[in-house]
Amino acid sequence: MYSAFMQYKEVLVTGGTGPLGRYVCPSLIVHGFLPRLFVRLGSEGRIAPDVRERCRVTPGDLTVRESVEMGAQGTSAIVHLAEMWKEQPPRGIPFEEAHVHATANILHSASLWGIRRLIFVSVAGARPGDTDPYFDARGKAEALVRGSQLSWTVFRPAPWYDLRDGAPRASPKYLEGLAEAIAESVRR
């Protein structure tokens, strides 16, 4: 099975088990890329079976620099979809760590391994200094990407889920279209 993977360019995908990632991974495959899903340990079961058999899965932690370094090694691009819409104090993960620190780790790893292409999915309304901690952290992470030396593309879609409870708000067609644009932009 893995010999078939040798002809593909591998793309690290964070957030591949989330609502958007479920559409991005198949789009990347259609465009001739091999997604390497960087997933939290224990969330591997959330990957759709048809996607799992056509990608690689690397468990890791975006907030741990060494983990991201290992996950990114050997990839040609990074699609950073991972996001947390609700702070998780019991697990000790504030927005700042989940978004800003994780994005800094992605940028560091890209630099370390010579990865030049980064696709970053932010959110409409994100800006550093926003009174809402979510939009503040997303804005700070986006500013890190924009200040990097990478060839980057930032997507700023409207939230496709309810920020209060995480329930999906967007139609599958919206997510499919966004996923297609993301996959197409990896080639640029």
Set out the residue ranges of the language-model regions.
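N-terminal Rossmann NAD(P)H-binding glycine-rich loop of SDR-like oxidoreductase domains
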Residues: 8-33
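Structural motif
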Residues: 10, 76-77, 117
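Conserved Rossmann-fold NAD(P)-dependent oxidoreductase catalytic core, especially the SDR/UDP-sugar
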Residues: 34, 92-149, 153-156
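NAD(P)H-binding glycine-rich loop region in Rossmannoid oxidoreductase-like domains
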Residues: 43, 53-101, 105, 109, ...
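Substrate-positioning beta->alpha
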Residues: 169-187
